[in-house]
Design a protein with these regions (language model features):
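Residue-level marker for buried hydrophobic side chains located in beta-strands
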Residues: 1-2
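Metal-dependent phosphoester-hydrolase catalytic domains
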Residues: 6-89
Length: 89
């Protein structure tokens, strides 16, 4: 499992190299979403997916999701949304 804020978009050539040896859970999950992963404290442009979970050696990924929950005392708890992947080994 390789996860993190890569600060590059999915079409970046470096990620294309990683795609040769690992799988993006956002792409392979049976259930997924299309939310941004970077919110920039509400100032980010659309189409900002720069956080990833890559895997190899798992039999499936039933679910990937971006947690975009809002809180009553603050809209954002970080400038990035958490991402979650459920994996079956």
């Amino acid at each position: 499992v390789l996860t993190g804020d890569f600060n590059i978009k999915p079409d970046n050539r470096n990620l294309k190299e990683l795609d040769k040896i690992m799988h993006s859970t956002r792409k392979i999950a049976l259930k997924t979403d299309n939310h941004n992963t970077f919110n920039g404290w509400g100032k980010a442009k659309k189409d900002n997916v720069i956080d990833f979970i890559y895997v190899s050696g798992f039999s499936s990924c039933p679910e990937y999701r971006t947690v975009t929950k809002k809180y009553s005392d603050r809209t954002y708890v970080s400038d990035h949304y958490p991402i979650i992947a459920r994996l079956i080994f």
